[in-house]
């Protein structure tokens, strides 16, 4: 039941790196195999994913460092847990239920992202939604502006954007309905939200 907690910090660090690497969109690896390094490294999805991991790791590290022997250990455990949660791998070095509420909420958001091929909302959809939202905000300021959603310099079709919006709507509705069903068992809000 101790998951990866029994392993040395070195093995945990290697596991962290590989969990994070395998959460990257497989298209990036395909581009690297084709020696299209510039195109692979300019992937907005890749940098959004890296940004999410780094931001979450830093925020959680700062939040939990008082309960750790050193800031380095806080970063170590935060990075491992963030990589595990965002990739839906499920490994652990510590019981993050003992962490402050702020850190657990961040982990709940990361569970939704689900960067790997196995499940979750996906970083690519987040990128498309953010670019669409930016275009809509610009349209509020300049109503005659005609904007298209572009990802990595390529136009995303209206059908794809529409599909992402519909998927997002249903994702939220199903999550809310599931939370309501789980709440019938009188769990606290944190348990209800994280169990969905």
Regions found by a protein language model. Give the residues of each.
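Membrane-proximal intracellular helices of multi-pass ion channels
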Residues: 1-196
């Amino acid at each position: 039941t101790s998951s990866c907690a029994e392993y040395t910090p070195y093995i945990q660090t290697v596991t962290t790196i590989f969990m994070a690497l395998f959460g990257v969109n497989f298209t990036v690896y395909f581009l690297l195999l084709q020696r299209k390094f510039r195109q692979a490294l300019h992937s907005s999805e890749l940098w959004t994913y890296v940004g999410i991991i780094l931001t979450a790791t830093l925020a959680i590290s700062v939040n939990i460092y008082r309960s750790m022997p050193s800031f380095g250990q806080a970063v170590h455990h935060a990075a491992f847990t963030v990589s595990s949660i965002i990739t839906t791998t499920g490994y652990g070095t510590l019981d993050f239920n003992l962490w402050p509420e702020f850190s657990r909420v961040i982990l709940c958001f990361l569970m939704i992202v689900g960067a790997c091929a196995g499940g979750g909302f996906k970083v690519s959809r987040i990128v498309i939604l953010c670019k669409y939202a930016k275009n809509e905000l610009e349209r509020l300021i300049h109503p005659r502006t005609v904007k298209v959603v572009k990802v990595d310099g390529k136009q995303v079709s209206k059908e794809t954007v529409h599909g992402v919006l519909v998927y997002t709507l249903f994702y939220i509705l199903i999550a809310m309905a599931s939370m309501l069903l789980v709440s019938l068992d009188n769990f606290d809000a944190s348990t209800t939200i994280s169990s969905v």
